[in-house]
From Swiss-Prot:
K(+)/H(+) antiporter that extrudes potassium in exchange for external protons and maintains the internal concentration of potassium under toxic levels. One of its GO terms (molecular function) is potassium:proton antiporter activity. Pfam families: CorC_HlyC (PF03471), Na_H_Exchanger (PF00999), TrkA_C (PF02080). The chain crosses the membrane at residues 3-23, 30-50, 53-73, 95-115, 122-142, 196-216, 232-252, 271-291, 304-324, 335-355, 364-384. Residues 404-486 form the RCK C-terminal domain. It is a multi-pass membrane protein. The keyword Chaperone does not apply. This is K(+)/H(+) antiporter NhaP2. InterPro entries: Cation/H_exchanger_TM, FAD-bd_PCMH-like_sf, FAD-bd_PCMH_sub2, Na+/solute_symporter_sf, NhaP2, RCK_C, RCK_C_sf, Transptr-assoc_dom. SUPFAM superfamilies: FAD-binding/transporter-associated domain-like, TrkA C-terminal domain-like. The gene is nhaP2. Belongs to the monovalent cation:proton antiporter 1 (CPA1) transporter (TC 2.A.36) family. NhaP2 subfamily.
Amino acid sequence: MDAVTINSFFLVAALLVGASVLLSALSSRLGIPILVIFLAVGMLAGEDGPGGIHFADYSIAYLVGNLALAIILLDGGMRTRVSSFRVALWPALSLATVGVAITTGLTGLAAAWLFDLNLMQGMLIGAIVGSTDAAAVFSLLGGRSLNERVSATLEIESGSNDPMAVFLTVTLIEVLASAQQDLNAGFLLLQLLKQFGLGAGIGLGGGWLLWKLINSAKLAPGLYPLLTVSGGLLIFALTTAVGGSGILAIYLTGLLLGNLSLRSRSTTLSVLDGLTWLSQIGMFLVLGLLASPHKLLPIALPALALAMWMILFARPISVWIGLLPFKNFAPRERWFISWVGLRGAVPIILAVFPMMAGLPNAQLYFNVAFFVVLVSLILQGSSLPLASRLARVEVPAPPSPINRSGLEIDLDSQWETFVYRLSDEKWCIGSPLRDLRMPKGTRICALFRDQELLHPSGSTCLQSDDILCVIGHERDLPALGQLFSQAPEQDLGPRFFGDFLLEAAANLVDLAPLYGLDVSEVADQTLGHFIAHQLGDNLVVGDHVEWQGLIWTVAEMDEGEPRKIGVRFLEEDPV
């Protein structure tokens, strides 16, 4: 490769990445998932588009795809709160194993019939498209405020179902390559346990060692993110090399790092955010370049039928069976999880496996997988806002600062600076600072008014459009948000929880005269205990129950227990 070729590569890569970034603004305007924009840019630059770039190197696509997925999952794991496992771990694992197997079987049967393949070849297509995609799920759910049970289940499922899909795909490729048509159940179970066991063990063990290394190393601040990423990739590669799931390993590594005190945590998350965007852009650009629309047209109708079968039948059936043991999922939540079976880069990367193995019909497998992913992203991704409203799984977004940054003062304390802009409707407008009931341990460190820095004192009165800088901890965000945050723009309205928020510790006998309640059978219970008894374990914000003509909604949680309960009349619509 000469200097001119290398420079041309830099030129084309910079143009494609820049175009993807600029065109990403169309995503919100047109209601199209941003990943489709990246994919479309790659296809337009490809051999059938105006760009005319011929790209058919599946090994490079495999390399880029795995590298990008590893970074995306590391970032996703670091942003996942381990507290969400309280409500979603076992349901997500059920969907990641039983759900993927059922989806693979049902989709494989349909694929064999639609494309006139034998059963094993059809099952290979089912395995390739059988898992949800972490990149798509993290990207499309990241901007939506869904109830924790639903969002955590989808995110943990997408981060942990790839071992099952990889296991099924590799096993079926080996069967087809050796012309065997029977499978040894014991061998399959051993391989599956190897994928999950090594992935979980090395991911958590390696993550703990990486955490100790990061916190003990004395480095320049900008080097900690590089150490985190390189360590995560090392764990990913080592796990894959010994036959485990590297994808699961790096996700668990990120989960462990994100939930422990970590040196230069804020800088690391900021760098990872940029790397994740670059990974998504690069991965979908390469996959778009790899696709040839003229090769998709001959299989468009059967591939569309397969995609609709998977979306409308295979995925819902697998979700309802996978969630059967978990009674706290409402039917509307099950339907929404069924609909958000987003396919993305993982099926396309898995479709590269048969190409690299030289299997017959390998190009067909790739084209079908690409078409199914395209339909899933466009149909399911674009309808996600509507589906979340219809299923009523959205909850009001918690008030948040307009900016936050870490203060590397003490490794264990994790101090942060939160920046708030005051709006007209905040009750604190006109109040002196001394009258604010700030959370214990927080302090206003700066006040900006009309672009000037003021020196606040206890007598300083707040005005609209003031910008406050507050030092505190992440645990202080709910209380600070109630004081200072602007209300997020959303369609849920201010009365989602009701006109009144009641303390969960309130006794029902005290509430009875206020709301005309008959509490003769539950007079000795608190409101929170009664709601928990009605709704079951693992409550999340947004859970509600109808009782005596009123809707009682969990409005705030504290360490797994309801803290505040909203109440509204049955005929009121919160949407």
